[in-house]
Amino acid sequence: LIKVSRVRQLVVSGTSIRDGVIAVNELNDAQRADFLMVISQEIAEASGRFAGLSDALKLLLQPLAKINPTKAFSRLVEVACNLADMCWHEHSDMRGDLAARRILGLPVNCMTHKERVWLGVALYHRYAGTKQNKPRPEELESLLGTRSRAEAVTIGLALRFALIFAAGTTGSLRDICFELDDNFVSLHVKKSAQSLFDEACANRFKMLAHSAHRQPKVFLN
C-alpha cells in the first residue's frame, strides 16, 4: 500500500484518524487544552440534564480557581465543570467510580496522564464526597502530588455542593457566590435561596472549605 500510494509521510494514530490529524496541530499546551475543552463541551451537551449548567458552574467556581492561580489550573476547572453531570443517570453508589473510569479511559490524546488522574479525582469526589466506602479506581492514587490532589478534591467537593444545592435548576446557582482568601472560603446566599441552605448543605460547604485548608464563612444576604 505504501509503495503504490507513494506517500512521503505516514501518521499512525493510537485511537482514531481524527485524533491523529488533530495531533499534528498540537503545537503547544494552549492548543491541546482547547481541544480538551471542545471534547468536554461535547460530553456536557450529550449528557447534561438541564441547559446552562456548565456555564453556571464555571461562574460560581471561578473564585475557587485562586487556590492555584495558573491558566492550566483554571482550564482544568472549566473542563471539570463541563463533565460534572456526566453520570447523573447512573446508580448513586457507582457514579463516582464510573465517572473517574470514563475520564481515565476517554479515547482521546489531548490529555496528559496527570490531567486524566486530576479530573478523575475531581469527578470522583463530585459524586462520592468524602465517603470512604465507595468503589474507586486504583489509578486515582498515582501520579499526583499532595497539593495537586488536594486541589482536585476541593474542586470536586465544590461541584458536589453546587449541584446538590442547584436542585435541578441553574437559577439557584445565580443566588450564591464564593469568595476565597488566605484563611476563609466564604459563601454568600441571597434571601431567595436561603431555604435551600439546610443543615446537610452547610455540612457539605464545611467539608469544601476544610479541603482547601480554610475555615468556612456563610453570609445570608
Task: State where each predicted segment sits.
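Helical "lid/coupling" subdomains associated with nucleotide-phosphate turnover
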Residues: I2-T169, I176-L187, S195
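General small-molecule cofactor/ligand-binding pocket signal
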Residues: L10-S13, Q215-F219
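Low-complexity, glycine/alanine/valine/leucine- and proline-rich hydrophobic stretches
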Residues: G168-V218
